[in-house]
Every structure is written in C-alpha cells, then in structure tokens.
C-alpha cells in the first residue's frame, strides 16, 4: 500500500469489524485528525476487564476523554496487567510515516506480524490519538459476532426477529 498512499494520511478498515454508526467511523477519525492538526487516530471502545486479552489495549493521557493522546499499546494483555479497558477496533487513520515503523516489525503475538507493534514503535515520533467512536461495533470474526450483526441489521431494516 505504501506506493499507492505516498505522503498522504490514509484509512485502514479491518474486514472482521463491522460498524454501525450515525456517521462513518473513518469519517469520525478523519475529523478528529483534522481538528488536532494531524497525527494518527485509532478507534477504540471500552471492553470488560476480562476481555482485554482479546484486543490491542491502549494507554492514554486521560481515559475520561473521548479522544486522548496515546502513550502505549499492547496486544492482547492479560487482564491483570492491561493498561486500560480501551480496546482497539479495526478502524484507523494513519500518517504515512507509520510505514517506516511497520517495515521493521517482527513476528509477534500468535506468530503474526502485529499492526499493534508498528503503532507502538511509532508513538514517540508520530502523534497518535485513541478515539472512542460513536456507534456499535460487531466482531464478525467470530460466529456469535457475525450472528449479532446479522440480527442487528435485519431488525434495523424492519425484519421481525425474535
């Protein structure tokens, strides 16, 4: 993607996260980026403490704010050591400099290259913000999440489902 993106900020949407929102999640992140004069912005939502080991979890300057500067991010931490309950969902607006950090990432949690590791290594030089987006997120990477999304959107379109 780097040759296509060039020197422009860009959005990333992970396919297993489906969002129903009053305005697009990427649009919300872009608006926050513009309001702050630049920087990367990552969508987050609060999760139950026992669920932190299923997500990338961020640490921020102020957990009470809708948008706050990130200070750290860890992939799937044990609930006992999670820095917050703010979980990353699959929506991002990045500055192009993030590619420089992603190119240096090695295999991480689960034997995979983790986007989280690239973000973590960029935090000292690329201003990065966590934003609690407005809307509902469905994890369509799980059977239950896919079913929940299907029922939600069917009901929203007027289908009667018990």
Regions found by a protein language model. Give the residues of each.
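Conserved beta-loop-beta/alpha segment of the NTase-like Rossmann-fold superfamily
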Residues: 1-60, 94-96, 102-105
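Catalytic-core segments of class I nucleotidyltransferases/pyrophosphorylases
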Residues: 11, 30, 34-35, 62-161
